[in-house]
Amino acid sequence: MPKYRSATTTHGRNMAGARALWRATGMTDADFGKPIIAVVNSFTQFVPGHVHLRDLGKLVAEQIEAAGGVAKEFNTIAVDDGIAMGHGGMLYSLPSRELIADSVEYMVNAHCADAMVCISNCDKITPGMLMASLRLNIPVIFVSGGPMEAGKTKLSDQIIKLDLVDAMIQGADPKVSDSQSDQVERSACPTCGSCSGMFTANSMNCLTEALGLSQPGNGSLLATHADRKQLFLNAGKRIVELTKRYYEQNDESALPRNIASKAAFENAMTLDIAMGGSTNTVLHLLAAAQEAEIDFTMSDIDKLSRKVPQLCKVAPSTQKYHMEDVHRAGGVIGILGELDRAGLLNRDVKNVLGLTLPQTLEQYDVMLTQDDAVKNMFRAGPAGIRTTQAFSQDCRWDSLDDDRANGCIRSLEHAYSKDGGLAVLYGNFAENGCIVKTAGVDDSILKFTGPAKVYESQDDAVEAILGGKVVAGDVVVIRYEGPKGGPGMQEMLYPTSFLKSMGLGKACALITDGRFSGGTSGLSIGHVSPEAASGGSIGLIEDGDLIAIDIPNRGIQLQVSDAELAARREAQDARGDKAWTPKNRERQVSFALRAYASLATSADKGAVRDKSKLGG
């Protein structure tokens, strides 16, 4: 029978000092035999996805206490990728994932907490907490802050839906008037919550459902809706049950590594491909799998991508649907239901509620359930009122979207495409693979060949695009922006958005060893591995080289002879200490970022730290 971890600090005469300090936090004699549960919050006023979380930790804590536990709350940092985008701040985004994971480990292990409730939401916070949860392997439940409502505005006598990406594109489009750009900017992000499309934050929150670590509805129920409060209340109660099951009944099925098994990771990736999730999810799932000591690699993702169709299409791949529409169609469980009926899921998995996949679908799939309360929950919709308050409205759609032929979520027979929304490509400068969000690629450019325009920083590429130096047919290559080379693996949302602003969204390709925002669409290929700074062949591409992209056949090829590439590699190696570094880039890199770069691996490994360099 496992012993409560917290007993280390609450039992025994030699722990008198620790108990004295616990008493100073409000604990009493009666508390010293109870499980101590960490409420891992991420409230900050910097990030709209987290601005409403201040009081939600208290909400969870009250339920933990009522159920017989002791709740202790702390916060992690949270970087807003949208605000950090387009300048040096983006260098810090991906490294913050590791800081978040480490900070959770530090706090939980330093104080010997028995379990956790993770209140996450945005891009690196959910992955960081997920990595920590699987590293620590103590009972955990995720409950996120929820998606933002889609923006809406009237243009040309028509009400259109908007999000952050629209504001960026129109702001850089010289054909758009100042007044229209201002109107879109003011309408794009109307409420608290994670940005309203299937961007990285919402993709990851959906994946925690598929992994079994959060409750049904977590990935899609709006931040502003009153129904979301119940997820927080339930999480506080349920975590105490899971904790007692493990420590008092020796039930290891309550542990995250036994819930988020390899089968669950395969289901999560299947969901991701089917819903056209952010390419960043590949990075984060690979990293989380390593923390769980699960053998889950790019090869597994490649195999899944070849058999899973696209059953859901959401912004940025279409402006017709946002997360509020996914929820109306049944949310994550609705997509999983269609995948299950197509025979594409592992059914022998359980979630934090203790339900198997078939049981979850029977109770929560809107196409199967007979529970009116569940149907009512999935009718939760937007209010269209600007607010930063959680649970501030109770609007509902008149009906569910259960049209699996023409609705937001489709059945296998009516799939958006036979190929899924993500694909892994391999070639002579991406030997370990690269990722493309096929959900956002127009059919006309699934095969594309063009001359390279090479840039050794995102900044130079943006200047060239806005300066008219990139023309239709070009393949923009941005290198030395990987985890080590950036350092920090910046997102390339500005270059891809500006290609659209310049009318080149369907006329150019962009390839990088960096990564893309979940808001990116178009022929945008990222995570090229190995990265240039690690001696990857992307560092050998020269202006004018022809690059052939073949998504249907999963290929990407630099049309240069092996002999020429060998000569270029020899010349690069001859640069000595300057080899595999940018030739003409001035960038201030802090000590913290240099420390991150010294251990960073390429994207095909999840951009995690190289344990071999630490003797691990």
Swiss-Prot record:
Pathway: Amino-acid biosynthesis; L-isoleucine biosynthesis; L-isoleucine from 2-oxobutanoate: step 3/4; Amino-acid biosynthesis; L-valine biosynthesis; L-valine from pyruvate: step 3/4. Functions in the biosynthesis of branched-chain amino acids. Catalyzes the dehydration of (2R,3R)-2,3-dihydroxy-3-methylpentanoate (2,3-dihydroxy-3-methylvalerate) into 2-oxo-3-methylpentanoate (2-oxo-3-methylvalerate) and of (2R)-2,3-dihydroxy-3-methylbutanoate (2,3-dihydroxyisovalerate) into 2-oxo-3-methylbutanoate (2-oxoisovalerate), the penultimate precursor to L-isoleucine and L-valine, respectively. It holds the Pfam family ILV_EDD_C. [2Fe-2S] cluster binds at residues 122, 195. The keyword Cell cycle does not apply. Its cofactor is [2Fe-2S] cluster; Mg(2+). The modification N6-carboxylysine is found at residue 124. Homodimer. Binds 1 [2Fe-2S] cluster per subunit. This cluster acts as a Lewis acid cofactor. Its EC number is 4.2.1.9. GO terms for molecular function: 2 iron, 2 sulfur cluster binding; dihydroxy-acid dehydratase activity; magnesium ion binding. It catalyses: (2R)-2,3-dihydroxy-3-methylbutanoate = 3-methyl-2-oxobutanoate + H2O; (2R,3R)-2,3-dihydroxy-3-methylpentanoate = (S)-3-methyl-2-oxopentanoate + H2O. The lineage of its organism: Bacteria, Pseudomonadati, Pseudomonadota, Gammaproteobacteria, Enterobacterales. It is an enzyme of class 4 (lyase). GO terms for biological process: isoleucine biosynthetic process; L-valine biosynthetic process. This is Dihydroxy-acid dehydratase. The keyword Manganese does not apply. Keywords: 2Fe-2S, Amino-acid biosynthesis, Branched-chain amino acid biosynthesis, Iron, Iron-sulfur, Lyase, Magnesium, Metal-binding.
